[in-house]
């Protein structure tokens, strides 16, 4: 009949490796509604670190499919590449262009968290659904530096 949880809970549905402290954990949100995607995993309220770190678009994403066409897809698997690409652009800005030549993983995560913007309906940040907020690369790069 399919897979299901014996006793489902709304929180604590993130799995390894997203629960590790040094990784950048990504949740999904609906960019058209500026709202959390309810299928996205949630962190635990009881751990000393809040996960996910941030959320990226993961609902109704246009993506290439085999055969040379496109389809509308949904899932955190489509949110994570937004963050990966943003991390790569930050590293280009920092290391290649010399704005932060000693940029490393934890600093990339800190820049992305700093630039995250609020998602509607939340008072507390970080939280177990969208972390520090939704991805915004433009706000992640320090002002005055191009």
Feature locations, PLM:
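Hydrophobic alpha-helical segments
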Residues: 41, 91-93, 145
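Charged/polar, solvent-exposed surface patches and flexible loops
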Residues: 19, 110, 114, 139-142
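C-terminal domain-closing interface element
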Residues: 123-146
